[in-house]
Structure formats: C-alpha cells, structure tokens
Amino acid sequence: MRKVAVRSSALIAMLIFLLGIATAHEGNEHATSVFGDLEFSQILTSIGLLISLAVYLTGLFRLWRIAGRGHGLGVAAAASFLAGWLSLTGALIGPLHDLSESLFSAHMTQHEILMLVSAPLIILGRPQIAAVWSLPVRWRKNVSVVTNNQNFEHIWQFVSGSFVAFLIHAAALWTWHIPMLFDATLENAWVHALQHASFFGTALLFWWAIINASLDWKSSFVGVLFLFLTSLHSGILGAFLTFTREIWYSVYANSTAAYGLTPLEDQQLGGLIMWVPAGLVYIGAGLAMFARVLSQTERRALDIDRRLQAAETANL
C-alpha cells in the first residue's frame, strides 16, 4: 500500500512540475526581455527545463550513491528520461517553437512530439523515483503521510486507470482542435499555455496508465485496446483535417505564404502528420505490447506444461 501511494504521489509531483515547463514557455508570448532578442518566455522555459533535469539527476545520483549504479533506477530508465527531456527541450525551445507560430503543420509537429515522444520517454524514465529521492528525508516522510491517505489513493487509482486516462486524453485532443479554441491559443498566451499543459499533462497520464498496464499480462490486453482506440480516434481527426476543403484555423490565414503553402495546404499537412506518423506510433506501441503479452502467455503455458509433466513423473 505504502509503495503504491509513494509512487503515485511522486508521479503527480513530477507531472505538475513538468506541466509548469509546458506552461512557462507561453508566459509572455510576445515580450522581449532585457537579454536582447531572446523572449522572456524562452528564458522561463529554459529555467523550468533545467530545474526538472536537476531534480531528476539529484534524485538519480543520490539513489545510486546509496544502492549502487543501476540499482533502484536502471541506466536504461535514466537514458529514457534524458531522451524525453531532450525532445521536450527541442519542442519548446528553438526553431520549431518559432515556426509553430506561423504554420499549423509545425504546431502540430510540436504537439505530437510532446504527446508521442517526450511523454512516454519521460514516464519510462520513472521520474517518480528520482523525484522522491531528490527530496530531503523529512519531506519524503511528509509526502508519504499525505499519500497514505486511502481517499487520495482511491482517487489516484481511478484517474490513472487505463479507461479514464484514455477518455481524459481523448477529450483534451478533440476539445483543443475546435477552431474557436485553437485560434485562441495564438491570440492569448494564457490559453496557449493551457493547451500545451493539457496535451502534455494528459499524455503523461495516458502513457503512465498504458506502461503500468504492460507490467501485468492480463492488463496488457486492455492497454493494447486503448492504444489502438487512440490511434483510431486521433487518426479520424487527422483525416478530417487532411480531406477538408475548408480552412478551420483562420489564425494561420496570413502566415503560410512565406513558406510556399496556402493555409489549406498547411492545414492538410498538419492533419496528415496527426493521421499517419502519429498513428504509426500508437499502432507500433500496441503491437509491441501485444507481442510481449503473447510471449508471456507462451512462457506461462510452457511453465504449466513442465509442472504437469513433473507431477505426472512424481506419481509414477
């Protein structure tokens, strides 16, 4: 019970912190800082990203110093987190971020990186463990007291269940592609912040549920189902954007010509990105999980056969 509670509380702490990163880069969309051409929002983003990395590395090295390198938190998990962190940094800072203000297709690429690259890699990095170990001992005890509360644990288990996480993530994806809301993201910095926080936060929750489902061979079938359902509904939205003959997002009406695209072509390209590459990620993850389930099932069957044969031999 205690292990589950600490694990869930640490994830929530990291989730909130990482949402702060997604939010920070929109804090002042058009402000120019005292540091020259670098936007103040980009400085906030950089600070948030560096703090998140420092938190993870502090917890990682503190744990390894006590338990030994690779124990408690494996090298592969640490590498996964770093890869996710780098992809998150690339999406929020630099050319892609700037281009996303002019092209819907670039904005879509940014969102897909957040949801399909950064989020699963960060969850595979097991940030909840590093987050707990980064805290002073007294704080760890306080966190444990809060999360050992049964009401808290029941709420977390409900929200992080595969079905609920799937619904929350799907709702965020479809809601923010309503034209009025999507246009508002480039017209209001706070709305843009909320959009990115919604996409990234619900993706973290979704991949947390899927990856944890994969740890149990029975729950893995549910995880596979929701991966394919996510591929289906996001693909439908992408197909709508690809085949429509109407411009959904007027905010890009005057910014695409400089890149040799009409607003409709840019929109269709964005839809294609959501439909095909993103869909392949979900399908690939689902197939990998299904293959793992089949392998586990086969091993279980062989183990049962060996036990039966051993029992028959013993009875002879």
Describe the predicted segments one by one:
Residues 2-8, 20-316:
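Alpha-helical membrane segments of multi-pass proteins
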